[in-house]
Amino acid sequence: MAAPALRVVRVYLDGAHGLGKTTTGRALAAAASAAGGPVLFFPEPMAYWRTMFPTDALSGILAASARRAAAQGGRADADAAGLVAYYQARFAAPYLVLHARVAALLAPPEPAPGGDDVVTLVFDRHPLAACLCYPFARYCLREINAEDLLALAATAPLEAPGANLVVCTLPPAEQQRRLAARARPGDRADAGFWPPLRNAYALLANTCAFLGAGGAWRDGWDALGWADADALAALADPRGGGREPVPAPALRDTLFAALKCRELYPGGGADLPAVHAWALDALADRLAALEVFMDVSAAPDACAAAVLGMRPAMRRRRADGAAGATLADLARRFAREMTPGGPEAAPRGL
């Protein structure tokens, strides 16, 4: 007799670096015996970035970013921007591979006969971190250009129903304190990067809420102001108040408003080219599939307990009963291969 179908909860812990996501994910995995079924943790793919290939992607992107910072303002130098975008794509690759592998194990969403067993998959970041949020922060800093950002965003994967994104956040002063405390060679813990990254995640949460409420980027696009150099500089300014998730976001509160730039209108034309509109349509489709939960991070054990408390409200996806063992093996192999020196030796994350 075939094993009863499983109900799979997919949880993506995300947000700016230095918030304790990795530690929280391990705390969740340690809670595998908690009510609600086993928890499988997929850590950050640090080895893929740093040791699996001759070039270290983290060192590479830091060097490319420094090269861009040494240049003058305005559009990023094409060569420097291309190098930053190349390394950013390297960061995305293992997330996209893992995402595709897990998606292949999920069954269609029709109700399953019987089978109340639940398995929770916890991922240290969603592919959107590398395809959209970090690139968006780099775009605000003028490390990459609009064409680079769109190219990276276009690689964001289709999302099967049942994806739950937990955006971890902290008050700006506390986040800055933690980043300063954990700074080490190879970290991107400078004070200039976290403000636009924090804003990227706030805008992401607003965008998902806007789309989830039935909003459409095409409605009101023409009335939006231009996201010019001053607007991007404001998103990158650590002295600003920053953007925050809002209860009922409008189009102006979303990533789409920050993407309305003159670079998308070649030759100064008045109409958005269809290919760019299609790219924004595709991005909207992917973001609309996410259920977003906000988490004001505390100690990792408290965060893990909070995430477990959210689990009953999270979306689920059916999988064949036989997929349970496959998912467990996948989690073990991914953790073993992606953690330099073993799970206990890994850096805390980007």
From Swiss-Prot:
Keywords, A to Z, come to: ATP-binding, DNA synthesis, Early protein, Kinase, Nucleotide-binding, Transferase
Q: Which reaction does it catalyse?
A: thymidine + ATP = dTMP + ADP + H(+)
Xref: SUPFAM superfamilies: P-loop containing nucleoside triphosphate hydrolases
> Is Kinase there in the keyword field?
yes
Q: Name the enzyme's class.
A: transferase
Keyword Transferase among UniProt keywords: yes
- Sites binding ATP sit at G15, A16, H17, G18, L19, G20, K21, T22, R178
Q: Name one GO biological process term.
A: TMP biosynthetic process
Q: Where does substrate bind?
A: Q88, R184
Described purpose of this protein according to its UniProt entry: Catalyzes the transfer of the gamma-phospho group of ATP to thymidine to generate dTMP in the salvage pathway of pyrimidine synthesis. The dTMP serves as a substrate for DNA polymerase during viral DNA replication. Allows the virus to be reactivated and to grow in non-proliferative cells lacking a high concentration of phosphorylated nucleic acid precursors.
Subunit record text:
Homodimer.
Protein name as catalogued: Thymidine kinase
Its taxonomic path starts at: Viruses, Duplodnaviria, Heunggongvirae, Peploviricota, Herviviricetes
Report which gene this protein is encoded by.
TK
